[in-house]
Amino acid sequence: MNLQNNQGKFSKEQFSKERFCQLEDEQVIEMVHVGDSDALDYLITKYRNFVRAKARSYFLIGADREDIVQEGMIGLYKSIRDFREDKLTSFKAFAELCITRQIITAIKTATRQKHIPLNSYVSLDKPIYDEESDRTLLDVISGAKVMNPEELIINQEEFDDIELKMGELLSDLERKVLALYLDGRSYQEISEELNRHVKSIDNALQRVKRKLEKYLELREISL
């Protein structure tokens, strides 16, 4: 009985694959939108490994790897649901954006709920060089050039990635200093709380800047 069921399932999967594999993803999505459940199953199966590959880039303290994958699958489903032909991008690019955003949103929500201090994200709009400067982490990443909408989307993904990697880049002292600084503390207040000289606080923030710039350079080379 089980063998017959498995054979039937296999035949259905084969039929679905043969039915859709010659079509563009955008055509399959049109079929999903008119209620074709086989078309939905086909896209979910097709992109499952893509989701797993994206999930490997992220981590969440206290969570299983499959939790991240499941969030990615939710993002994939949303991309299928929300994609429209008039979008000026391919479905795969749109799906990647939705998957990444879903994973990042889940991680940020979880870290806030667990009250984990700056283990994975920081504000990119806070001045970083010194208290008299209005230059921010955002400026370091984007530079002075005027960005078009497509570049803004790409850079937003970069920002999210940097936020999640920040905990790996910085030392314990640098994370503490940056967390307090982003919380609005002055150099003097940070030095008193951490029992460090003001110069040590300034040096820590300078190292944060250099590490971030180095990371961005290496990331650019690898792309």
Curated annotation (Swiss-Prot):
Output the Pfam families linked to this UniProt entry: Sigma70_r2, Sigma70_r4_2
Q: Which residues bind DNA?
A: 187-206
Coiled-coil positions = none
**Keywords annotated in UniProt:** DNA-binding, Sigma factor, Sporulation, Transcription, Transcription regulation
* Gene Ontology molecular-function annotations: DNA binding; sigma factor activity
Q: Does the keyword Cell wall biogenesis/degradation apply?
A: no
User: Which parts of the sequence form the motif Polymerase core binding?
Assistant: 67-80
Please name the InterPro entries in this protein's record: RNA_pol_sigma-70_dom (IPR014284), RNA_pol_sigma-H (IPR014218), RNA_pol_sigma-H_factor (IPR016371), RNA_pol_sigma70 (IPR000943), RNA_pol_sigma70_r2 (IPR007627), RNA_pol_sigma70_r4_t2 (IPR013249), RNA_pol_sigma_r2 (IPR013325), RNA_pol_sigma_r3/r4-like (IPR013324)
* One GO-annotated biological process of the protein: sporulation resulting in formation of a cellular spore
The source's superkingdom equals Bacteria
Q: What does this gene product do?
A: Sigma factors are initiation factors that promote the attachment of RNA polymerase to specific initiation sites and are then released. This sigma factor is involved in the transition to post-exponential phase in the beginning of sporulation.
Family in the record: Belongs to the sigma-70 factor family.
This chain belongs to which protein, by name? RNA polymerase sigma-H factor
Record the organism. Answer: Bacillus licheniformis
